Every structure is written in C-alpha cells, then in structure tokens.
Amino acid sequence: MSTLEEVCEDVRKRIGTVTRDDLGPVSARDFQRFAVAAGEPPGATAPPLFLSSVLGWGAGPTGDALSPDGTGDETAGLPLDGLRLMGAGQDLDFHAPVRDGTRVVRETSVEDVTLKQGGSGPFLVITMLRMFADESGTPLVTCRDNLIARPEAPR
C-alpha cells in the first residue's frame, strides 16, 4: 500500500467525526474590512463569503510558517503532512445573516475522501463539511470544501 493509500484510509476512518470550535464573536470592523477588500460596500451584516473564508479571528501564521503551497498547519487534524493542498471548490448554503457581536460556533467533519489517478499521478479528493451556527444553534452558513491533496513534486 502506498503512502497516499494509507493517508486515504486514515482520513476515511475520520468520516463523520465532528470537531466543534467556538470562534467567538464576529466584529463588524472585521467583516466590513473583508467587504472592502472583496470590492463590496461595507454593511450591517457580514458579506456572504466571510465565514467560509476566515479560518479564525487571529492574525494567522507568519510567511515563514507557511508551507511551499501557501497553507498553514490548519488541516482539521488530518494527517496531510508532506502533501500539497489545493482548493477544489466550495458549495455554500446561506441560512441567516451574520451581525456584529454574533458568537460563531464551527463544526467541522470529513464527509468523503477518494483516491484518484491523474495524468501526473495519484491524488486525494477530500470533502470537508463546515457548519457555522450562532451560540444558540441557529445555522448561519453550511460549507462543503473540496480539497486536492497530492504528494510533493519530485525535486
């Protein structure tokens, strides 16, 4: 069994396991800055893509802490060390507006993983489910992220 096959099996065992994170309150200042950066007018509610785009409210990793593909070490606890990660699209459902002070809770789980063969070799397609809700459980955004994970290119 190849290393990629082993990773696939390890990720498959995690399907359905939910990790819950309290992201804390959303700040109007943060989502209004996001709106301006995205070319939208700032408003009283967060832009639709705000929650699915922000991994946390902190400053994030420094440039030297990023891997060569530009990702940090946030991989939802998956064993993806040594693999290159690429986004492969999102499906989003918007349920309720996000306003200043809304305390956001995120639940993350693996929904699916598939080992595929491409022209340049094998790769994994991983579907992650991220559900954002307020502290009372009211759904805000449901996000299905598709990721491609492939071995580092030979040097």
Language-model features: locations:
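Hot-dog-fold acyl-thioester-processing enzymes
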Residues: M1-G89, P154-R155
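HotDog/MaoC-like acyl-thioester-processing domains
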Residues: M1-R12, G89, F94-R155
